[in-house]
Structure formats: structure tokens, C-alpha cells
Amino acid sequence: MSGWRKIYYKLLNLPLKLLVKSKVIPADPVTELGLDPSRPILYVLPYNSKADLLTLRAQCQAQDLPDPLIPLEIDGVQLPSHVFIDNGPRVFRYYAPKQESVKIFHDYLDLHRNNPELDIQMLPVSVMFGRSPGREGHGTPHLRVLNGVQKFFAVLWLGRDSFVRFSTTVSLRRMASEHGTDKTIAHKLARVARMHFSRQRLAAVGPSLPARQDLFKKLLTSKAIEKAVADEARTKKISHEKAQQNAITLMEEIAADFSYEAVRLSDRVLSWTWNRLYQGINVHNAERVRQLAQDGHEIVYVPCHRSHMDYLLLSYVLYHQGLVPPHIAAGINLNFWPAGPIFRRLGAFFIRRTFKGNKLYSTVFREYLGELFTRGYSVEYFVEGGRSRTGRLLEPKTGTLSMTIQAMLRGGSRPITLVPIYIGYEHVMEVGTYAKELRGATKEKESLLQMLRGLRKLRNLGQGYVNFGEPIPLTTYLNTNVPQWRDAIDPIEAQRPSWLTPAVNDLAGKIMVRINNAAAANAMNLCSTALLASRQRSLTREQLLEQLDCYLQLMRNVPYAKDVTVPDKTPEELLNHALNMNKFEVEKDNIGDIIILPREQAVLMTYYRNNIQHLLILPSLIASMVMYQRRITRAELLRQISMIYPMLKAELFLHYSKEQLPQTLDTLIDELARQQLICDKGSELVLNPARIRPLQLLAAGVRETLQRYAITLSLLSANPSINRGALEKESRIMAQRLSVLHGINAPEFFDKAVFSTLVGTLREEGYISDSGDAIQEHTLEVYNMLSALMTPEVKLTIESVSMPAETNNLLPEPEAEDKEEN
């Protein structure tokens, strides 16, 4: 580089250092993209901009990547280490220099032809200042590139809202080997790079925003809404104009009013807020979504719902991943001042709890959702319908998902892909309210006062987690499961083909399974799991560390799913972090520390334990069977677990099929034996007395679930003809009784949704006949197996209420030896 050029770059860099504070995407490009800083890198930028180049250089220096200003010298040939695909517009348009990108690509390909060992990494990089999509009909398109003067003002006003996006590298060695090294390949490289950057920019900025009233006018002209308006006028005996005004009023209630300026402002506020409330936001597998957006997919985000914070957190994360924040389906209960108008400007559109009895509303909402898809906006909705009060996933609500498939049946060209997302926290601000609601308190209506009270409590929230699960392309799903689905395409009328409901229910189940497949274990949910497993909710520091190590080894050595994230910290580091959250007490004596979960915190901590219960449920079940039965063959253990696995699968959205179960159990048994929690004697699995404590704590993870199953099965065995409603009600009553008598501090233990799922599974598995009567022989078999995994006291409480004398005669005699329950 010449001396004058160095001086020029230094002078230009001075204002950039003051004005530009760019984010890098992904956060760790070397690791996430597999870059090798020791190998030559050719940086590829979309168009000639020295501001972009110097912004890139600053990030390369921060990431320990080669300097894009220093030329590469290979085999005595010196070539620039960066290339601009296009020159971009000029201030003085009569001067248009020749494009050099094709020549530079050709020179690099020539080097690879002459040197078989050479392999240069071609690294596409885009630098963006601001991301305003613009309004429809307002002048220049949002994908335009800027000349020097425009770039100056962009840096001046938007330097703090800029990002540097690194993409996956392309091997020039592979290009040379597979496609050759002539000039046509160089032209092709430049053309493909140009398309890549154009798509990437569209994914970051999104389509132009419509004027709200123009959108309403367009919706009013849709055939479906015209028909619904006519029906409204006829059924309510009002004028057509009045019915049309009713439709517009509903559009005003529903529609978002997205504003880029509001997003920019909220990003600053949220960045400040997260940095003070959270110790970190952990994001995993975001590259999947970036790639989908770049490939032109219509993305529907379907996260689990833990907290009102979810709305803000996910939009914040997506914005920082270089993606457009989605339009979010929010409950109408959040449409209060000032939250409603703010959420609306950030992309929220509001949805009522039920559409029943209001055809005009359902039609307007369906058409609005379809219009969002048609225009290419990403959408987010919570498939659970509401926030989970227990920390587990709720049964999915399928209304909006059904409308998503109906939108495909309008004949839209863009492929729709569902992206399940796991959102987790070490502290959920509403968890105290959830516990009260589960105990019967009336849900408090959302309001400004409630919001201010909630904000007052926000402090020391630990870590947050956003894990993107495995996407579900709807076209692929329908092609596989409903090959004839295209026969139902109708651009005018909303279609409800016979296959729609079964397909939607199956899809909803797959979404929940994939959310759980992306769960995040953390210090809080691991420590809560261990302490709640102890009868006195307390463990010595050594015992707690031993149990944390047991959980971590299980999760690392036998991963539940490839997308599950497990902390890379030691048990000591996790415990120290959890103690800093001020949820636990530490009592010191002459021997050492005792970690105590206070009684008032115990109920709240079940929420965090339940976040990851599905990750440990099968090892807990194996541990329980070995602990209570002392010795058991692998075949018998598989037989017993196979009997209750369908109930666990339905309740916890487990991903293992019945066919995968034997191999999964064998792998888990081998790991438990490796940890010496059990002894594998070849023909039998035997209790290891030396490791009874961690085995008991592990087994306790399934204890309450098995007791709940035993309650329902004992009632069914005693009264096979009991109807579903009575069975669920009596099961809840008995569960409440059991929780009082035996100190079970878990509100979900008698949650009606859990019993409803259980009874539905029993029917599907054939324990309840088509006539509605239980098959006593089968229910008793499972109950007897479950009762062998409970203490005599718990078993006696259940049977004293549910079992008449004649049924008790069918039960096995209790063992003489009592086994302590922890």
C-alpha cells in the first residue's frame, strides 16, 4: 500500500472511529463459520465503499482475522485481499471506472490452476448502515446502494445502527477443481456473489411497508372479506356501509403499525436494559434462520411462551442477527395504553382469545395473516396460546397454525417454513404470579399499573437463552404427508379440506417436540432439580456438586437431542453462579456448607426444574426401577418402561419413537453403569449401595409423575365405567390430597391440563375401550407396576381412597421392607 493511501485511510478512519459502532454477525465468526485465520482470505464486498472497507477492517482486527487492506502475496504475485463486486453509484455519474472484480477473481483462479496446494477462502462480507425498508410508493427502493455523499450521511446518522455480516466461505480450490479457472467462471462467481448480497440485504431489511389505510383498502377488496361483510349486513340487518365499517374497525384492532424508527429506539432501550438485567443472552443455531431468510423462505417463528418478556427478547435477538423483526401475534389483553401502541409499532398484531361466533372477525384476521405472508413479512406466534404457568410446554392451540396452512392454500409462491424456538430464563419475572394462579387465584388483568409493578421487580435475572430448533418446511411436510394438498388451493375461499385438522394437530405436536429438542440446561434449572429431589430440599455442597456432575455427564455423554445446549462450566462454577442469584440459602457449620432451598422458594423453583424435566425423565425412570426393585433384567426394565412411555411421551413431548426406545435405554443404562450409579451384571442391573445417594436423587425426578399416573390408574381400576370428566376431576382432588399429606410442593402435580392429557393418552393406548369403559386387567397391570415404585405410605393413601375391598384383593402384597423416599 502506498504512503499516500495509508494517510488517506488514516484520515478517513478518524471520523469512523467516533461515529461507527458496528455489530458483528455471527458473534464469533471464526468458530461459527469455521474460518481458518492461518489460511489466506479474500474478502468479497458488495460494492465499492471505503467506509465499508474500514468498518470491516475494524471488525477483522477485533476478531483476529487478516487485515483486508494488506495485499496477499502468493507465488511471487501480489493481489488485493479484498474485492468489490460492483463499483456502486458515483456522485459524478459521467465517471464510471471499469469493474475489477472479474479480473481479480480470474487472477486468483489462475493461481489455483498453477498451485495445486493453494486453497484461498473467499469470504463474503456485507456492511450495512441502517435498515429502513421504506414505504410503498415512496421513491427509491430500499435495496439501492449509496453514493459517497449519501454514505456520508448514512454513517453520520446510522453509524451506531450498523452491522458487519460474515457469510459462509467458498473454497476457491473447490471452485477451480470442479468448474475450471477460465474467465467465464470468474464472471459466474461475480454474478452469484451479486445475487447473494441482494438476498442478504432483503433478509435484513424486509419488504417495503404499506401505508396502513392502503392495506385496509386492499383487504376490503378481497373476495372473502366482501362475502363476510355481505353476510354481516344480512344477519345483523344493518347497511352494507355499516358492515364495512365494522370490518375496518376490526382491522384497526388487529393490524400492526410497524415502524423502523420505533425498532431503532427500542433496540437502544433494550440493549441498555438487557445489559443491566441479564448477565448474558445466549443464542444458538441462528445461522439456520439467516440461511432460510436469505433463501427466500417465508419464516414463521413458533417459540414456547414463558414470559411477556418473550415478545421483546426474540425481536431483539433477531434484529441483532441481521434479520427483520417479525410481525408478532399478541394477545388482545396486551392492547392497553401505553404498551399496546408501543407493541403495535414494534410489529405486534393483536388476536382475541376466541373467534367463535364472529365470522367477520375470523375472516378479517385470516385475510390479514394471509396478506402478511403474501407480502413476505416474517410472522411470530406462540403455539401454546398463552404463557406456561408450570414451566412445561402446554398443549398447543392450533387456530393460528391452521390459518397458516390455509394461507398456503391461497396459492402463494413463497415457501413457508416453521421455526420452533426454545426460550429459557434463569429468572422469570411472573413466576410468583404463576404459582398463585395455579393455587386458584384469579388471573390479574394486564394494565399499566401491573406493568410498573413488574418493572420494579426486574433485577438480577441471570442468563437468557434463545435456541432455534430444527425448521419444518411446510411444503416438504405436506408433500410427504398429504400428497394431494395442492388440490385444495383456492385463491378466494378459505379452504378446510378433510386432511387439514389431522395435519395441523400432527404439525403442532412436531413443533412442541422440536422446541423441547432445543432446550437449554443452565445453572438454575440444574440446581433446582437436585435440591427439589431431596426430601428436605437441602444438600451439602459436596452432595449438590456430585449431583450436578451426574446430570452434566448424562447430558453430555448421552445427549437428549443434537440441539439441546448444556453448560460448558464445571459443577463448581454452576453452583457459584446459582448462589449469586439469591434463590438459595447457605448454612455453614463446622463440617461445611449446606445449600438450602427455602420453603417459600421451593414452589417457584419447580418452574425451572420443569423446563428440563424431559431431558432427565428416562434416566430418572431407570434409576427409580433399579432403586426400588434392587435388581432387574434389561428385558424386564424395557417391558415396564414401554408400558408407561406413551404417557410420558404425550405429557413431556418426548421425541423418541417406540422403535428407538430399546437402543436409547441401553445407551442410558451403559452411562449409569459407567458412573457406577448401578451395576451391570450382564443378565441383571443391580443397585450399587456405594452410590445410593445420587441414584435416589436422580430417581426422584420421576417420582411425582409416576404418583400422578398411579392416581388415575387406581381410579380407573376401581371404577372402570367412570366418565372422562369425573375421572379427571377425582384425579385432581386426590392429587391435591396427596400433595398435602406427603408434602409435594409442585403446583403442576394437580394441574387439570396434565390429567386431561393423561386420560387422552390412556384412551389412545387402548386402556379405555370405545364404549368408554376401562379394561381393568390392563389398568391394574400398569398400576401394580407403578405401585412398586412408590413408598408404602403414598401407596396406602392412594388405595385408601380409590380402591374398594374387592379391587384391593387383586393387588400384590406390599413388600415387608420399607424403602425410604427422598
UniProtKB/Swiss-Prot annotation:
Q: What is known of its domains?
A: The HXXXXD motif is essential for acyltransferase activity and may constitute the binding site for the phosphate moiety of the glycerol-3-phosphate.
**Placement of sequence motif HXXXXD motif:** 304-309
The species this protein was found in = Yersinia enterocolitica serotype O:8 / biotype 1B (strain NCTC 13174 / 8081)
Pathway, per record: Phospholipid metabolism; CDP-diacylglycerol biosynthesis; CDP-diacylglycerol from sn-glycerol 3-phosphate: step 1/3
Keyword annotations for this protein, in alphabetical order, are: Acyltransferase, Cell inner membrane, Cell membrane, Lipid biosynthesis, Lipid metabolism, Membrane, Phospholipid biosynthesis, Phospholipid metabolism, Transferase
According to the UniProt entry, its GO molecular function terms are:
glycerol-3-phosphate O-acyltransferase activity
Q: Which GO terms describe its biological process?
A: CDP-diacylglycerol biosynthetic process; fatty acid metabolic process
Q: Which domain of life is it from?
A: Bacteria
Quote the subcellular location field of this record: Cell inner membrane
Q: Sorted alphabetically, which CDD domains does this protein's record hold?
A: LPLAT_DHAPAT-like (cd07993)
Kind of enzyme, top EC level? transferase
Query: HAMAP family, from UniProt?
Result: Glyc3P_acyltrans (MF_00393)
What is the protein name given in its UniProt record?
Glycerol-3-phosphate acyltransferase
* Main localization of the protein described in the UniProt heading: membrane
Membrane topology, record value: Peripheral membrane protein
Q: Which InterPro entries match?
A: GPAT/DHAPAT (IPR022284), GPAT/DHAPAT_C (IPR045520), GPAT/DHAPAT_LPLAT (IPR041728), GPAT_PlsB (IPR028354), Plipid/glycerol_acylTrfase (IPR002123)
Q: A Gene Ontology CC term for this entry?
A: plasma membrane
